[in-house]
């Protein structure tokens, strides 16, 4: 124990950002009562100002087969403002990002990431699948996060996209 005397504690940078009030999340869910029809998508547009390059964590979930996409420099209009949640609920700091759900997409832009989520496959299929990824986004760039229900039997499925980041 003597060697730890006067030692400084260390914290993960993610935890530091959370404590400082620089951690944010948003999400959109299609519930079991209001599932995402086969072939349709949840679309979320997200953008940040110049000079802000957030480290973002992407999580997607679908009760059946789905494909998740991330596009950079997508062109969209309209949509509904999506609230960005402060992960430190005591913080007074607001996110500098802007998010929309359900925009009209006129150009997908460049495909950055694609992930297949398989749900309910085989004898031991669990009925759902989650996937995720982390990356650093660029400021002054519009990103489109898309989760498409790819159910081959034309079944609607519960689905969600959750995005979390530090600024």
What are these regions (language model features)?
Residues 1-7, 17-167:
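Beta-strand-centric surfaces of beta-sandwich/beta-rich domains
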């Amino acid at each position: 124990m003597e060697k730890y005397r006067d030692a400084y504690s260390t914290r993960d940078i993610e935890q530091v950002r959370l404590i400082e009030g620089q951690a944010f999340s948003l999400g959109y869910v299609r519930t079991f009562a209001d599932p995402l029809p086969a072939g349709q998508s949840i679309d979320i547009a997200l953008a940040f100002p110049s000079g802000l390059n957030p480290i973002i964590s992407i999580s997607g979930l679908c009760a059946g087969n789905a494909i998740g996409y991330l596009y950079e420099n997508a062109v969209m209009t309209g949509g509904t403002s999506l609230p960005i949640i402060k992960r430190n609920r005591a913080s007074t700091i607001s996110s500098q990002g802007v998010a929309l759900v359900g925009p009209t997409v006129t150009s997908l832009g460049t495909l950055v990431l694609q992930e297949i989520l398989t749900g309910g496959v085989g004898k031991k299929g669990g009925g759902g699948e989650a996937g995720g990824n982390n990356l650093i986004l660029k400021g002054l760039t519009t990103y489109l996060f898309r989760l498409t229900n790819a159910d081959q039997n034309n079944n609607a499925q519960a689905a969600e996209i959750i995005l979390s980041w530090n600024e």
